[in-house]
Amino acid sequence: MTTPFRYLVRVRYQECDAQHVVFNARYGDYIDLACFEFLRAALPSPRDVFDGTFEIQTVRQVVEWKAPARFDDVLEISVWANRIGTTSFTLCFELRRAGEGALLVTSETVYVHVDPKSFSKREIEPRMRAALETGARGKTTDHAGYLA
């Protein structure tokens, strides 16, 4: 596989629990942020994410925890499309500490494309399908200041 899209985010104090590790529910937040940045980088126009052109809802999310992340770690989240159907698609996520190889968390998340008013399923247009297939390969969004 070519280099997937990467999103870098720093773990903040309020995202950690009494065990001094990232609270388990926060991984869903990181995945949601990475999905948004992936779509912003991959879709034909960044506005497609904001203007209702490509409205999505999460319908299934499986998260597998392998090791803890801690306060001030920089998480490197790799994102790619695994399957693209008629109205839904699956994104895969791998979370690691930036610069390290060991997996902390993996996720497969299924999204359905919906009409922004009725929330009924909507077919994924060919140009959006092509954008998901290409997937912003090789691009990185750094909200941690890690690469600066």
Name what the model sees in each region.
Residues 1-76, 82-148:
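Terminal targeting signals and extreme-terminal segments of soluble enzymes
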